[in-house]
Amino acid sequence: MELEAMSRYTSPVNPAVFPHLTVVLLAIGMFFTAWFFVYEVTSTKYTRDVYKELLISLVASLFMGFGVLFLLLWVGIYV
């Protein structure tokens, strides 16, 4: 197969929206991270729920992870 016959790969996400995605995803991730820390500090060991802790931390880590991914793409580190 020749190089000219191949179609050029285009990203499913427009690079012009990388800054906006970065800010939004990191802001949402920081909100859930702050919620997790406030929940840990204000609850006693009797009122804590491990499933709620896991859910909040999972959502926070997903948003922060994708936010960091788009931050890397925004600054030109293509992973």
UniProtKB/Swiss-Prot annotation:
Molecular function in Gene Ontology: oligosaccharyltransferase complex binding
Any Gene Ontology CC annotation: oligosaccharyltransferase complex
Keyword set includes Repeat: no
One of the GO BP terms on file: protein glycosylation
Highest rank taxon of the organism: Eukaryota
Classification via InterPro entries: TMEM258/Ost5
Pfam families registered for this protein in UniProt: Ost5
Keyword Membrane included in the entry's annotation: yes
Residues annotated as transmembrane: 17-37, 55-75
Main location per the UniProt record: membrane
UniProt KW keywords: Cytoplasm, Endoplasmic reticulum, Membrane, Transmembrane, Transmembrane helix
Bilayer disposition of the protein: Multi-pass membrane protein
Protein's cellular compartments: Membrane; Endoplasmic reticulum; Cytoplasm
Biochemical pathway: Protein modification; protein glycosylation
PANTHER family, A to Z: TRANSMEMBRANE PROTEIN 258 (PTHR13636)
UniProt subunit comment: Component of the oligosaccharyltransferase (OST) complex.
Family that this chain belongs to: Belongs to the OST5 family.
Role played: Subunit of the oligosaccharyl transferase (OST) complex that catalyzes the initial transfer of a defined glycan (Glc(3)Man(9)GlcNAc(2) in eukaryotes) from the lipid carrier dolichol-pyrophosphate to an asparagine residue within an Asn-X-Ser/Thr consensus motif in nascent polypeptide chains, the first step in protein N-glycosylation. N-glycosylation occurs cotranslationally and the complex associates with the Sec61 complex at the channel-forming translocon complex that mediates protein translocation across the endoplasmic reticulum (ER). All subunits are required for a maximal enzyme activity.
UniProt protein name: Dolichyl-diphosphooligosaccharide--protein glycosyltransferase subunit TMEM258
Source organism of the structure: Xenopus laevis
Gene label: tmem258
